[in-house]
Amino acid sequence: MSFSRPSGRTADQLRPVRIERAFTRHAEGSVLVSFGDTRVLCTASVENRVPNFLRGKGEGWVTAEYGMLPRSTHTRSDREAARGKQGGRTLEIQRLIGRALRACVDRNALGERTITLDCDVLQADGGTRTAAITGAYVALADAVNLLLKRGDIKKHPLIGAVAAVSVGIYRGEPVLDLDYPEDSDCDTDMNVVMNDGGGFIELQGTAEGHAFRRDELNALLALAEKGVGELFELQRAALAG
């Protein structure tokens, strides 16, 4: 029997990706990013303050928050605010987004400012954290470009681009950019964050069904490099538009 994916995509094919800039009115940067049916609103907000541990050091800070709308999935989930605390998954993902974006910022060039990336999942169909990172980078770029245009900073603080994609082993085959049916039924699931210099910022990989081999890991990383390369092209095209 020949291998096929539920979506009909080839093993190395991304879902259709759209990056819509200036999606909301008030934020210094805002992007609606779509990976197939996964849609995440990413906004960048600039504040002229830094956390206490950075006061007086002349450095800026980049951080992130992540959340899912109650009906972003098949069944409604209570808002975390109604529960009184954020869940472990939410905290893990927003820390990942913050780490990924700080990896592309010269915080000295930013000055004593904080840029907060709010990533709100409007609709989830797998890969929300990787979509959030990819879209949040573009929102961040718009925010720092505005700071430069206003003369608030003198030097561009971005030292590269960042994007992320999921890969996994689905029915024995390495595949790129898992959607929900694949993610919920895969043997291995991995999230890969990279910069546009070819460097890896973070790898998150877990065997769900059976342990993966070194050759399978190599195949997954090769797929991720291909996919992230395509995402960098889409980011550049969006920022040039």
UniProtKB/Swiss-Prot annotation:
Binding, phosphate: R89, G127, T128, R129
Gene Ontology terms: biological process: rRNA catabolic process; rRNA processing; tRNA processing
SUPFAM superfamilies assigned: Ribonuclease PH domain 2-like, Ribosomal protein S5 domain 2-like
Residues forming coiled coils: none
Annotated Pfam families: RNase_PH (PF01138), RNase_PH_C (PF03725)
One example GO MF annotation: tRNA binding
EC number: 2.7.7.56
Designated name of the protein: Ribonuclease PH
Organism in which the protein naturally occurs: Xanthomonas campestris pv. campestris (strain ATCC 33913 / DSM 3586 / NCPPB 528 / LMG 568 / P 25)
Gene: rph
